[in-house]
Amino acid sequence: MALHGTGSGCYNPSMKDSVQTRALQCLLEASPDGKMHCVEALEKDWKAGRLTLDWPQPMDHVLDAGRPERPVLVSPRDVPRRRLGSVEGQAAMLHAIAHIEFNAINLALDAVCRYRDLPADFHGDWIRVASEEVYHFGLVRQRLRDLGFDYGDFPAHNGLWELARKTAHDPLVRMAMVPRVMEARGLDVTPDIMRKFENIGDEQTVDVLKVILRDEIGHVEAGSRWFHYLCDQRGLDSESTYFSLMEQYLAGHMSCPLHKEARKAAGFSESELNHLEALCAG
């Protein structure tokens, strides 16, 4: 089901909703502003104990998330190259980051409302992550607006959400492939992006990226922690399972260099880092 356009209100405060119902409402909300407000209310009510852990509906039919009509989604190869030599190039880079953060909001919400047979702490972690991704999206969107642009002004691709669809059937696979692969890759590349903005004197964007990098370590760590939890529950060796899934879903492809310090803080072992670097070497 594909959802576009402007969504309706997020919730009825007169009812005690389940966390699944509320997270799903936020997930399907198409308006960026509406989604941000919805997540803020979701986190507030979760912390206040106003949400139940009932699961009133299956999620098998939900294969897409709410998003606005723009940006137009294109193949990754058709996304314009982002060079920082012009204001438009700077905006294009910021737009790409904003799109990642918008997708990350949806990914966290999807984890909250899709995977029911997990401890309350799992849902609390991903509600927190969704809230932090909302904050990141707002920071990057403001930088876009400072340059005279907004989210939706450039084309974008849907690769991150496509991986979410492929991993929807199993939280173990989702934790391995989204936080521990896609988001972990963000830990690797963000320092270089920061240097590029620093080289053109854009300290405001550098400061935004510092916040994102700091918080994303925590997001990847949450993915690592729940991946290990699920492996333990199933009697699986976590490292061999991780690399088996990488081979299955990404043909073992890996890009380097790695931000090893950040990955260690996010729950990667020295053995895993050595294995990842070996994949880079081919």
Please give the residue ranges for each predicted region.
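N-terminal amphipathic/basic-hydrophobic helices that include classical n-h-c signal peptides
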Residues: M1-S14
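Non-heme di-metal
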Residues: Y11-G282
